Amino acid sequence: VPDEFAYYKEDAGKMLLGAFEPVAKPWGMGGISEDFCFDQLPEDFDHFEPILEQAVNRLPLLATAGIHTFFNGPESFTPDDSYYLGEAPEIKGYWVAAGYNSIGIVSSGGAGFALAQWMNDGEPPFDLWDVDIRRAQPFQKNRHYLQSRVSETLGLLYADHFPYRQKATARGIRRSPIHEQLKAHGAVFGEMAGWERANWFADEGQTPEYQYSWKRQNWFDNQQREHLAVREAVGLFDMTSFGKIRVEGRDALPFLQNLCANDMDVEPGRIVYTQMLNSRGGIECDLTVTRLSDTAFLLIVPGATLQRDLAWLRRHLGDEFVVITDVTAGESVLCVMGPNARNLLQAISPNDFSNEAHPFGTAKEIEIGMGLARAHRVTYVGELGWELYVSSDQTAHVFEALVDAGADHGLKLCGLHTLDSCRIEKAFRHFGHDITDEDHVLEAGLGFAVKTKKGEFIGRDAV
């Protein structure tokens, strides 16, 4: 009975009543003894009483029936209600199958099979991204965070799983430097890997919050206007949550040539869209690579897959003279996208943004407002645009300069819902939704980003 967070079943001639209460009580926050196994905890009838009261209304016989056993036991819940499976990214050879969120028995056969295959072959036998341990973020081991979040995730098992439903607890951990400015403009935030991201913008006088529904939700018209602004004028997205990985050293080029399906041997300042493949030709990483110098490259990956992609890089690092660094927090990303993007940037920058001076697929250092940025001419929405990589300490200024000048160019602040609809309209892939490690790069329609003539690379034999 999801509305009452309860379940009923016959058990050895008796009625068993259990529950996934909406607000759970964290246990073991101070540590769990090494010899602990599943056991009974002290009775906590006050905590269970609201569930029992609703059960009596549903089954009045319970009011006179005696309670044979009141069992209170612990169960493991993760921050996102999915279990952890796979090799720990920090420790090679350390395999994990944990956090089963009360579905351990039903998952055991499949999870055991998948993990055994993964351990034996070195690759998961099929797409396991939803339960892959590499989705976990380093900050999620913080006990204060866990105490707050798991009090909610248990109850979500029996809650309505509305599209785009956001967690309510343990929020605000990772924020863009312009978080408060976006909030003042009506941003309604969603969470991804701890990042607070503007998903859509409420109009003046509109309550800036989700109203969940199985039908069109309250943000639909807002998102439509944002989408049209990107198509017809210019939109501004805060994509600071992009994962940013710096790969540098004298062996950086051959290291990336072995991992990437596209050709990394390009001039400094060039941007290359590529995938990293497994031995089956499946897609392990979907990214852009910008060559910064002869020995330095910047990899831009989805924020949700950053830990996965870092683990993939480090797993394949041998004796090469290469340093891999997560530089995500050092730069913000402001995406100026739409037919008027060039005119807007030209209004606040002395640099030349023409096709001749700044062609597609190149990155250049620019002046903007009173700040500096690195402008990448790429697009994830299918329109003319630039991604501006700005030092975190200058982001607020650059944002204000763009907004102030934007009124003359039809600028509209846009959220992630609009980014998603635009990239779907253009058929741009998104890892975890459209492509995974079990999707062959050619079957995914990404053969244009595969260069077999460049020489050997992981997955070449499969394509």
Where are these regions (language model features)?
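C-terminal catalytic lobe of FAD-dependent flavoproteins
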Residues: 1-3, 12, 25-174
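Beta-strand scaffold of nucleotide-dependent catalytic cores
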Residues: 9, 17-20, 97, 400
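A short local loop/turn or secondary-structure capping micro-motif enriched for an aromatic residue
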Residues: 17, 24-27, 104-106, 199, ...
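Glycine-rich beta-alpha junction loops
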Residues: 12-15, 21-24, 74, 101, ...
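Short strand-connecting beta-turns/loops that link adjacent beta-strands
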Residues: 11-13, 22, 89-91, 294, ...
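General beta-strand recognition
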Residues: 16, 84, 93-96, 298, ...
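Glycine/proline-enriched, intrinsically flexible loops and inter-domain linkers
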Residues: 126-463
